[in-house]
Amino acid sequence: MAKKIVALVGDGIGPEIMEAGLEVLEALAEKTGFDYEIDRRPFGGADIDAAGPPLPDETLKASREADAILLVAIGSPQYDGVAVRPEQGLMALRKELNLYANIRPVKIFDSLKYLSPLKPERISGVDFVVVRELTGEIYFGDHILEERKARDINDYSYEEVERIIRKAFEIARNRRKIVTSIDKQNVLATSKLWRKVAEEVAQDFPDVTLEHQLVDSAAMLMITNPAKFDVIVTENLFGDILSDESSVLSGTLGVMPSASHSENGPSLYEPIHGSAPDIAGQGIANPISMILSVVMMLRDSFGRYEDTERIKRAVETSLAAGILTRDIGGQASTKEMMEAIIARL
């Protein structure tokens, strides 16, 4: 039976790089027999422009029934400061699908080391994953703004913490088997719970080493010794900040994918960068982050490990051959980058 993939086409450069990702998927399917169907839907500003809500009911229904979801950048300056914004649709989708675990791999391509703001010897061997709890804590607590006082409620249950930490340990089992749990347990009650749960979950994974870091120390280590990390797991707010910090290590957002997983429903895969409206429609956007998001989908949702390695090798050899888009120091167009990768499948 064909796998159903919903493609949520966003704003700015979104349509261009989504098509590049889907063309690579199509080329792979022709070689391997992967059976799938694509349900393309506008998302983000396009929905709002059509006088609709940021997350239409039919889009939510299709997403719930899908085997996997591909999403590309949303947002535009025209929605800044207005009541209805594209980002509200994404937040609602995460909540409705219970996408509790955000997975962001950080790996430096050898051929792109020169882009990093850190010295080559400092980023050598960097290959870690940030696992961020995505649906709880202060972002989803009550937000109370008064005339001269404000409160944001930080709230976590045992179950919310347990499932995200368990996810991190499961990922670590297939890597270097080190989990670094990041908290602020010397100050915050939620972090005291976080550390307690981490210690308890670790008992179920005797083959995996658990380490603890306070968030301020972790932020420093991510710059001074990033190769130390294997799997980082942390709460929503800390994860938001640290995952963005980690993205700087590569020197470009154009090659970084991410995934958001639920417990039982479909997962969502997307590049980490924005919609880049300043270059939209010019055919120069880097499609690699979208293509690598497709890679994560093939691996995590469909278990097609050989296919994922095939695309990753094609990306790496294309970069090593000097085929680079403008954001990473070359002159290749979106189409030329995509075609180079397809040719190397």
Curated annotation (Swiss-Prot):
Pfam families: Iso_dh. It catalyses: (2R,3S)-3-isopropylmalate + NAD(+) = 4-methyl-2-oxopentanoate + CO2 + NADH. Its main location: cytoplasm. Its EC number is 1.1.1.85. Its cofactor is Mg(2+); Mn(2+). It comes from the Bacteria. GO terms for molecular function: 3-isopropylmalate dehydrogenase activity; magnesium ion binding; NAD binding. InterPro entries: IsoCit/isopropylmalate_DH_CS, IsoPropMal-DH-like_dom, Isopropylmalate_DH. Catalyzes the oxidation of 3-carboxy-2-hydroxy-4-methylpentanoate (3-isopropylmalate) to 3-carboxy-4-methyl-2-oxopentanoate. The product decarboxylates to 4-methyl-2 oxopentanoate. This is 3-isopropylmalate dehydrogenase. It comes from Streptococcus pneumoniae (strain ATCC BAA-255 / R6).
